[in-house]
Amino acid sequence: MRIPIITRRQFLEASGVAAAWTMAPTTLRSAFALPQVNHKFDDIRSNLLHLINEEREVEKARPLELDDFATSVATAHAEEMAKNEFVSHWGRNGMKPYQRYSFAGGYHATQENISAADNTWSMKPEALKQDTSYLHVRLYQETPPNDGHRRAILAPHHTHVGVGIAVEQLRLRVVELFISKYVEFKPVPRIARPKDVIPLNGSLLKSNYLLNTIEVFYEPLPKTPELEWLREPRSYALPDESQVLRPIIPPPYEYADKRPGVIQVKSTGEFEAPVTLFKDSPGIYTVVCWLRRNRGEKAFPATELCIRVEDVNP
């Protein structure tokens, strides 16, 4: 009997490649310990960064920088997926990408791409480099309307990316965590009570951008999902329930709905806003600053700052 010879690419396709697109401390310190980044994968990370920036250059989007903190967060999720044999934007604790990043100590806006291959032939560095490149290119080559990964790679407002890589036995997991760094916050409480008013103080890092609105999203506390649930592909998004805060505008100008603005914005780019945790029940609030460069441009999310409310007396 003749044994068919197949390429590594054919083997990856046959073994099942999975990919899917689109989380306390009292200050901005990490809510959990992040793993040490395995530097044996540095060459693979550099190669993926090179691929990403080549693809962005074609679309005239700015090149991204590799972010160490985002890489640590991405690595933690990649390792968890590899060890527990699942592929999901949700973690074992039920947290989504922006929640993981925020409760680790971050607050910038994120987008996550994940990819995976099982039963890979070789764990040698050059073989893994080929596999991770192939997995990434599959995401980049998506076509509308199912092109969420590609849009994450090419989004013009991203500034940085973290790359997490994990190998467990013959399981390979890759996490690309895209970051948008435009805002700096002063320390913010990460644990609060229902109906608390959190003073939010920040500044824009780029003078050619405007603060359009601040949107405060609410969702219930995450529940621990079953592993079988994590093994089913699904996309993630911010929750539907939210309240919008707008900048104060001088009289005689007013908003069409007559509601007053509450965000004080200075000419220096500094801003202040009272963020009300508007529900009586426990949950997670995510504070999103929407920015734009001019009045006619579509606003984009620049922050995803999460605050956890557990009960009346945390």
Language-model region placement:
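Short beta-strand elements
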Residues: 295-314
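Eukaryotic low-complexity, intrinsically disordered acidic/proline-rich regions prevalent
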Residues: 206-212, 259, 281-283, 295-300
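N-terminal secretory signal peptides and thylakoid transit peptides that target proteins
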Residues: 1-19
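Short, compositionally biased P/S/T/A/G/V-rich stretches that sit at domain boundaries
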Residues: 168, 177-205, 209
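Extended low-complexity, serine/threonine- and proline-enriched intrinsically disordered segments
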Residues: 208-246
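C-terminal segment of classical bacterial N-terminal signal peptides
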Residues: 23-29
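A well-ordered secondary-structure block
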Residues: 97-180, 213-220, 246-290
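Short, well-ordered surface patches within globular domains
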Residues: 34-103, 147-151, 155-162, 170
